[in-house]
Amino acid sequence: MGLKFPSSGQFLSIDVIDGPDVVPAAKRLLKTHSEDGGVSVWDSSSIFFEMHGLEVSDRPSARTLVLLYAADLCFRLRWEIIPALEGGKCVVAVPYIQTGFAFGAVAGLPQKWLTEVFRFAPNATESYRLNGTSSRKLGPPTSGFIEFCSTTLNEDLRPKFATYFEDLDRRGRCRPL
């Protein structure tokens, strides 16, 4: 990919279950780490916003959704995250790569393929998870990647994502917020 990741700044990530929880959680985390920084949120490139409402008879495959997520993430890295880090700022990326891995695992995609797709994305210095309340009504498809995929696949995927993130926590790969 050719993305040069700076050594300056502080890079944090949060993977969340409910899209509406994204910005408040990211702002709280940012305040605990820095007075100067920003938040990079899902669908900055508008890929998913543009896809929502398209009238097509075929639903995109799980691989297509992962590739689109990776493309959006690459856009965010190139145009939002890396420039802020180069300026010495703290950046909270929400969601980040574990959401892509979680969706791939839930959809039964090979781990090796997922690792190859996301190899361009560096690990965050600190990774967090935020499990929402799955008793809450599923948000609109434009509120988050999990909501978009759940709507596209006609299945509420939040419980499966929560299980995936809890397993990451048990293995020390992220911490709960």
Roles of regions detected by a PLM:
Residues 1-8, 12-15, 21-32, 136-177:
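NTP-dependent small-molecule kinase module
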Residues 1, 77-79, 115-119:
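A generic local structural motif
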Residues 36-113:
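ATP-dependent small-molecule kinase phosphotransfer cores
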Residues 98-160:
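A glycine- and Lys/Arg-enriched "phosphate-lid" helix/loop adjacent to the NTP-binding pocket
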Residues 75-79, 124-132, 165-167:
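Low-complexity, flexible helical/coil segments
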Residues 32, 82-84, 120, 167:
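Alpha-helical scaffold elements within enzyme catalytic domains, especially in hydrolases
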Residues 7-8, 86-88, 124-125:
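Short loop/turn elements that form and flank the Walker-type P-loop nucleotide-binding site
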Residues 12-14, 42, 92, 126-132, ...:
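Hydrophobic/aromatic beta-strand patches that form the interior of the parallel beta-sheet core
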